Each structure stands twice: as C-alpha cells, then as structure tokens.
Amino acid sequence: MIVLFGGQKGGTGKSTISINVSALLASQGKDILVVDGNATQGTISNWCERRESTDLPQLTYVEKSGNLYKTLDSLRDKYDHVIVDTGGQDSKEFRTAMLAADILITPIYPNQADAETLVYLSPLIEQAQEMNGELKAYVVFSKVHSNPKVKAVEDTRKLIANLDRFHVLDSKTVTRVSYSDSIAAGASAAEMGDKKAAIEIENLVKEVFS
C-alpha cells in the first residue's frame, strides 16, 4: 500500500505523523520504504539517518523530487508499505504522488483556517481520482488540545462535513513534546516511552491499514 501524507498547509504534522506511523509499522515487522518528497526540508531523511545509528527497527528511505509517479508505482510491490511525505504545499511531487497513492492523509489543526484549505485541496483530489480511481482521501486532526472540554474537533468536523471528497478519521494526535523530542533521537514518540502517543498512532494505523 502507498500512503501519502500531503496537503496545502505547512506545519500541521505531516512529517511527524508519517515518521511515527513508519516506526510503528517497522516495529510490527513490516518492510517499509519511506519516500521523502520534501527534500528541501529534509525532516524525513534526517530522521532516517539518525535512526540508522540506533538499535531500533530499521526501514529504507529515499529522497525524490519532481514527478514521483513512476518511482512510486515501480516500488509498490517491493515493500509491504510505502510511506510518502511531500510536505505542506501544492507541488509537482504532491500531485504526481496522488496518481500512485492508495491513500492520501491530510493532517489539519482543528480550526477554521485549516478547514478552509480543504476547500482548495478538494478539486486537486478530484482531478487525481479521475486518473487514479483507487485513491482515498482522509483527514486526521493533528496537534489537538489535550483538554477534553475544548470542542475544536467537533466544531471543525461540522465545518468540513459537506466536503464529500474527504473521510475524516476518528483517530487524532494531541500536542505532545514527545513527538518533537523523538524526531531528534531518530525514534518515535512511542519508542521514547510515551504511552499516550503510542495509543494515538496505533489507533491511526488500525483505522487506515486494517
């Protein structure tokens, strides 16, 4: 399966979530390829390089730019899962990766500004689905406030309920220091001992990959 993390807004947790998902799948014994399609930022590649010096479950990674379709399509059957990160902008990498991907996951903050970016993303997904009928588009809420009294997720769900190109996932990630600290160590938040973060990523993987 090819799973693409992408969207039109930066800083919403695409790289962080893709890293933690990749680490969990690797820990389950899956053969994982991580494709860094946002080489100018290099978050994924740098994390993978740091991980190589640890005893943690390893994965393969490559940096690719430009048209990603042929690369992804040729690698589809060579790995259990291919995880792609194209960053937070409308780019050639993002558009061509959608043509090969089985699933697009777009993390957003639970607020109106992020919800509105989906309005502009929706026609791009429609175009991609015309050529790639297998593509499913998911939204996951990222960096959610830990206070359960804050109703931002519920409010934002209502804002995007009429965008039929997207399926909003039940799983979500909460703002946690462990997510950023673990990246610096070449690890995942779960591998650094954060049990709550581990549950969040486990729920996401079950919902998407089951």
Question: Where are each of the predicted segments found?
Answer:
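P-loop/Walker-type NTP enzyme "switch/lid" segment
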Residues: 2, 6-8, 12, 23-95, ...
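Hydrophobic positions on the alpha1 helix immediately C-terminal to the Walker A/P-loop
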Residues: 17
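Inter-motif core of Ras-like GTPase G domains
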Residues: 93-112
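G-domain G4 guanine-recognition motif of GTPases
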Residues: 109, 136-151, 171-181
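Conserved C-terminal guanine-recognition region of P-loop GTPase G domains, centered on the G4
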Residues: 118-133
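C-terminal boundary of histidine-terminating zinc-finger modules
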Residues: 183-198
